[in-house]
Amino acid sequence: MARPRKTTRRRTARPRRQKRILNCKPSPKTEDDWTFDDAAKSEIAAATATIPTSKDLRTTWWTINDQGSTGSCVGWASADSLLRWHFVKSGKLTTSQLLSPRFMWMASKETDPFVTRPTTFIETEGTSLKTALDVARKFGAVRDTYLPFATGKLYAGKASTFYATAALRKILAYFNLGTNLTDWRNWLANNGPIMVRLDVDSTWDDASFTGGNLDTYNPASTRGGHAVALVGYTADRFIVRNSWGTSWGDKGFAYASLDYAQAAFTEAYGIQV
């Protein structure tokens, strides 16, 4: 009598993750920042406003992009996730136009306070959220056609022309929103997206296998700083917009639990234009 064949169940291998550079540095001198309270007292933020139970700023024109294997997260979080939304809403940009993440990224690296040695040309060397916001406040932002991300070409015109163009899209101010989740909801509901920093952990790395849900932050597994944006919230989650393409998370987005958001996001900034 023939013995029954022993069957083995094959495990489905997870696709290999793309290697990402994580180089967003903590912002310096945050104790000097204007705060949510300052914004409220100056009537930029509505401290006593009724906060809706949910808010979703996502829209079809605001597409997810991919920084690839570069260390440009600060450029993408500031130009593509924060400034672009505001300038489209204020009529300074059409829905089909992109801002240059490369300008925000390179200008931040060139002007940040991390100057023990020249590092603008070193891919893995990063910069901070606050430096990018200072670039946007002092110099402004340019469209991607002036300094394209994909080609790496330099601007061939005069510096005065470049910065005159950038000056058309300056921000007026930025505000440090701290780690108060109620203030975050208030800002998202009444003022727009928030740029945040986190140290990427294993939960973040697994977002493509959890439908984008970020439930529990694992500080023991962190491996470097990253800049992204909050673009909405529900009763128990914050909607996160990344720059790792649509294959990450839920088509480029993630949903951070309140506990995860409180533990993971070490900085949060909103702007006025």
Where in this protein do the model-derived segments appear?
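Predominantly the structural core of cysteine protease catalytic domains
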Residues: 2-5, 10-19, 25, 51-53, ...
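Active-site-proximal helix-loop elements at catalytic-domain edges
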Residues: 19-46
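A generic signature of intrinsically disordered, low-complexity regions enriched in glycine/proline
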Residues: 27, 37, 41-42, 60-63, ...
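Active-site-adjacent bridging/hinge elements
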Residues: 46-58
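Active-site-adjacent structural elements in enzyme catalytic domains
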Residues: 58-106, 120-138
